Amino acid sequence: MGITIEAMKMIRGEAAVAGGSRTKEMVLFGLFTALIAIGAFIKIPVPVCPFTLQLLFTTLAGLILGSRNGACSVGLYVLLGLAGVPVFTEGGGPSYIFQPTFGYLIGFIAGAWLTGWISERSGDFSFGKTLFANLAGLLVVYLFGMVYVYIINNFYLGTPIGVWPVVLYCFVLAVPGDICLCILAAM
């Protein structure tokens, strides 16, 4: 059921020949930055690990905008939040880097880039290949997020946490919903 290669090239601007492609690129940057910010506030309450729709929009940014533009769009979202615009789930500002969840924001940038990079190189936007790209990006997001949670809790906040509790609470309990978002983004 996946999207056609021609349609994806048109969306990414690869088929554009002249003039408005830079404007189109800027509009798509802004659109995905706004969608990610909106996704931060669409919370789906589940026990222990409520999740947001940010992952859906960061994944789609990588798929639709490509590796460079997708990562830049997510990076713009993070920069806006660090500049004080309250676009993160718990507000914004430079002190947000001390929040345990900040690693996931860094992971969103890397995950969008990897998702876009894999989809660009596959040359085929079938469901299976797109899902593979999405899951690879998801793993990168979780890698950055879990490492950051461990480091910030143990070395800055002074609330020691072991590796296994981080894996349990930040991966095992949280990943099923995000896998569903990866499947949704691949459709």
Residue map of PLM features:
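Hydrophobic transmembrane alpha-helices
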Residues: G2-S73, A83
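Membrane-embedded alpha-helical hairpins and interfacial helices in multi-pass inner-membrane proteins
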Residues: D124-M187
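Non-cytosolic membrane-interface motifs at loop->transmembrane helix junctions
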Residues: P50-L55, G92-P100, I161-F171
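Interfacial aromatic-anchored transmembrane helix boundaries in multi-pass membrane proteins
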Residues: A40-P50, V78-G111
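Short helix-perturbing small/polar motifs within transmembrane alpha-helices
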Residues: I3-V17, K24-L31, I38, S95-L143
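Alpha-helical membrane-inserting segments
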Residues: L35, G39, K43, A61, ...
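Central hydrophobic cores of alpha-helical transmembrane segments
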Residues: C72-L80, F132-A136
